[in-house]
Swiss-Prot record:
Pfam families for this protein: Defensin_beta_2
Protein's recorded name: Beta-defensin 125
Signal peptide boundaries: 1-20
Localization of this protein: Secreted
Keywords per UniProt: Antibiotic, Antimicrobial, Defensin, Disulfide bond, Secreted, Signal
Highest classification ranks of the organism: Eukaryota, Metazoa, Chordata, Craniata, Vertebrata
InterPro entries, A to Z: Beta-defensin (IPR050544), Beta_defensin_dom (IPR025933)
Keyword Zinc: no
Organism: Gorilla gorilla gorilla (Western lowland gorilla)
Positions of disulphide bridges: 27-55, 35-49, 39-56
Gene Ontology cellular component terms for the protein in this record: extracellular region
Start-end of Low complexity biased regions: 110-145
Amino acid sequence: MNILMLTFIICGLLTQVTKGSFEPQKCWKNNIGHCRRRCLDTERCILLCRNKLSCCIYIIISHEYTQRPAFPMIHLEDITFDYSDVDSFTGSPVSMLNDLITFDTTKFGETMTPETNTPETTVPPSETTTPETTMPPSETATSETMPPPSQTALTHN
């Protein structure tokens, strides 16, 4: 039983090691030559392969070797793009932010004058407050028990 297992292991390893050497080695440009010890009469030796083998190339190229077709020429004039949606999309393709939007850099209360392009500070008008407008009427608190906020600030100082 041990000899049988050892035989299977050796056969498995041999097939893994020698897979590349079962077919003849190719050489020269686009693998049109074969590595052999001695070239045939219809072949010519061009250079040497490994292990003292000659790279033999047929004198007359046979039809069994098919060359790759040349790549088709692409004329840039024939390529057209559809620019119909250029006006509708103004953002960047990554962030999808609109490039036409500008952010307002002025502070609150400042306006930009178009003549000089300088910020002007405007103070909002002060509102006059009365106790009736600041204090809403309620059932629990009356105006006598709780003074308006402007009077409480003056009395606690």
